[in-house]
Amino acid sequence: MNKAIILLIVIFMTNSVNAQEKIQNINFLFANNGYGFGYEYEKFQKSNVSIGLDLRFYDVRNDEYPIYDPFYNQFTVAGEKDILLFPLFFKTNYYLFDGQIANSFRPYVTFSIGPFIAVDGDETISSFAKKWRSTESQTNLGASLGFGVNFSQPSGNTLSLGLGYDHLSVDKPIHSKDDFGGGYLLLKYQINRE
């Protein structure tokens, strides 16, 4: 797996030397296993193809549910697990219908691959700082496939809405679960364009 990661980094670096346009985005992700946010950097190789880097943070929350305690008249969370995922994906976007429709509406297909780190915090410790001192983590290979639409704003910034699927499987199960992938909804806001 280390050779594959090194190969991806070399390909990314050599292909990005002649890039014409660079874009940075902030992403908000709503997945069936939780929620997250991310940072995205893309460089256009052609007018309809870009490559880049996609850094994400997921807080896994799918097995939790509220329980009402009538004695204290409060809700508590049952099944709480402190699992964090940190994907580092190398991505490519292919923009459909380049030059055929108005520039303010740009559909695209995206594919990403790379390592991700899964971190399991100790749920028995209530202190946030102490909880993350004694963690178990593992690194695995993940991938993502999706599609979306960029909407250009008159100010020059771009908003994007997309749907996709993450493949995030771990080698050693965490809380008897080995697949943290699934569908996601992506909201993207462009923060910089060079």
Indicate residue ranges for each PLM-predicted region:
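Surface-exposed strand-loop-strand hairpins of Gram-negative outer-membrane beta-barrel proteins
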Residues: F30-E40, Y65-P66, K131, T135-Q138
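Generic marker of residues within folded, mature protein domains
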Residues: I9, N18, L29, K43, ...
